[in-house]
């Protein structure tokens, strides 16, 4: 089996464009993926959800992120904030931008933002001290030298879903179905949990 990894936005475009995948995994919104005819609509299977979390430099005080108001206060007091650049296709970055708009603080925080190449890049900025606060998916917070504060509250930032399909162009349909069933199995659920994801929708 060959696994191909990419940004959420990049993978999404590849599936819509008809690139060869047997079991593509995408994130909402994905109606255009279904409309493209490149996936079997009836095969849709929710795998897991992952929240955007907050990290600080190791040993730094951990801010309160228990509510949207607390999150707004954190951003107001922070001198610099790193997160994955949504223009690079980073789904976590899209979620963060949506949160800024939802909280009504997009203009206020703009001058503090440091948009990084992917989640790993955002965490490197935190570890080095270049950014006081960093955000990306909890599953991407593996950089040495950071402390994970925790997930943003759902009322501030909606967790992102991972949804899989069987490709309409799969060379081995039975094999693709078997893989999809495994990816939604209890064994796979344990793997998702180990990476700070919640199985299911």
Can you say where each PLM-predicted feature lies in the sequence?
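Short active-site loop at a secondary-structure junction
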Residues: 42
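Exported/periplasmic ABC-transporter solute-binding proteins
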Residues: 1-19, 26-37, 45-50, 56-201
